[in-house]
């Protein structure tokens, strides 16, 4: 007979009650301690349930009940400080359900907790008015003893702290760890708890807000959020989030009603709806409270057999609505870990338990740190943290398509999530979640990012450095200047093609790579060998976080994808024809820079025309699919074929003469150094790109084989063809690894 294993959950919030249901479903013995007299008090405002949490709630059988008392977020609205609409999309809920299987729903915290509690079968395992005062742990593998304020004692194999920001379990874990293993808890865990914002939350009845959906109102150093309650109830949840004058370190005591009233009076005239001010909303409110918004993510969330989850382990800014959903994710992961340990007969194996909890700690630290950073960025933008954020919020983002500017960013918060492995799977949408993907993106370490930036920089500088070290040469190679100029121009076609493709990726929308034209203009002015390394270094920096790979990696504009090849032919027709005819026109070299700049403009104009004529599909079916890949393939293949033909022709005609001149003579010519720098950069970029694909498990191709192919193709076909080929290869690998299957089919292969 198996040795009994008991879990003691401290805290009856979303995390604790969800975990209790999961442990029952998996057949584990547990007890739950809650210090309040009611497991579902009518306190707090609302809870937002996003697809990553909804799918787990569906697995444990409470989602349908939640929906009965919840309001779906069908539309997205954002208002300026003057009350004008800057963003409106009535299809948000429909699109989210299509993509991820579930809409966002909003319900009262009371109803959420009540539904979770009602689902629990063994209600005798729930103990109210049990405030934990002390925890004792023995040697690894021994049981923990938990004492409560009323003198009760509980024994468990694993104690899970889910008792919120002001956690007694966390305090006990720190006390025990500091006593037994000083330094185990990093100082930044204790000093990293900070409150940057304060919120006033409330519930209003018939305040005059439009029914359905949610609304956000932007303002200087503050923002607002409103959401309708159950349809037909007339109830609206609202909140004001305002930035503190200075960040407050540590756990913040509860704030007074006087502080709340001061904020309400200060911002009473703020427009938060059409014809509605904060003062008017407050007059219609039946409940309001003030809370400090504390933020932190602990590096250490367990010691021996004490584990922290939910707001005990991390506290996120609520603007992104991921607090409760992250708690549900953590509960599901704990339940899965215990199931797997039981399957391996390792529940009482101290080493096995430590390893499992370490993996939990590492995974959740990465996940919740990303969520915290994302939420903080959203709040900074909505509250105009600086002039740049204000400009983006009011003048840039509202002009971008909703499916490009918002849905991919929302999706990147949902799709890294797990669900429960050992229960029937939840509903699936068009986008895969992390467990369904071959790729396993993790954040790249700062050291790796810096190392690759240094590597790319050295590659760019290498030819120039060698030139300085080698003996001076008097040869100027006058007969080869036109050859070098032509070769540089052909390489620039491949480089600008890469830039244009990348500029249509949702993951680079708010980055220096959002448009290719500035980079091309800079290259024409300063030189391609000076601009390309800067671009590639920015790309390395932009892709270091997990969110980059959970955002669609393909072109968001099918019209632009279809226009790539025709526009390439149009833009480069004149310099191409003049070159093919061996023209001696002195203005030939002037046509290439013009063509480089014309190409992205033609792509943009063509895509705008195609969208205006409704000649291409639009919306989520394009943004979240790889339907653009066939058009990218044709485009990059054309570049590879033409550039390799130029490479082979020039090598055939001039290779022997160039070899006779020698390295010293070649590197004495500036154009030759430019070519060498670009070639070294392209090889270095290919090396980095294959390493990155291996790092995120997007390919199983060995690095030695991949790097050999890059070097050989660069020598035989030229760097421009090598760049085009490596770019397309990486797109195909990402498409397979992220399971982004086409949602619409290309039309008869015509572009």
Swiss-Prot record:
Result of knocking out the encoding gene: Abolishes the production of arthripenoids but leads to the accumulation of a new compound that possesses a sesquiterpenoid chain with adiol group at C12' and C13' position.
Protein name: FAD-dependent monooxygenase atnA
Induction: Expression is induce on medium.
Organism (species): Arthrinium sp
CC per GO annotation: membrane
GO molecular function annotations of the record: FAD binding; monooxygenase activity
Active site positions, chain numbering: 218
Main location: membrane
Alphabetized PANTHER family for the sequence: FAD-BINDING DOMAIN-CONTAINING PROTEIN-RELATED, FAD-DEPENDENT MONOOXYGENASE ASQG-RELATED
Necessary cofactors: FAD
Function: FAD-dependent monooxygenase; part of the gene cluster that mediates the biosynthesis of the meroterpenoids arthripenoids. The pathway begins with the HR-PKS atnH that catalyzes two chain-extension steps to form a reduced triketide, which then primes the SAT domain in the NR-PKS atnG to initiate three more cycles of extension to give a linear hexaketide corresponding to the polyketide part of arthripenoids.
Phylogenetic classification of the source organism: Eukaryota, Fungi, Dikarya, Ascomycota, Pezizomycotina
EC identifiers of the protein: 1.-.-.-
Protein biosynthesis in keyword set: no
UniProtKB keywords: FAD, Flavoprotein, Membrane, Monooxygenase, Oxidoreductase, Transmembrane, Transmembrane helix
Single biological process term from Gene Ontology: terpenoid biosynthetic process
UniProt-listed Pfam families: FAD_binding_3
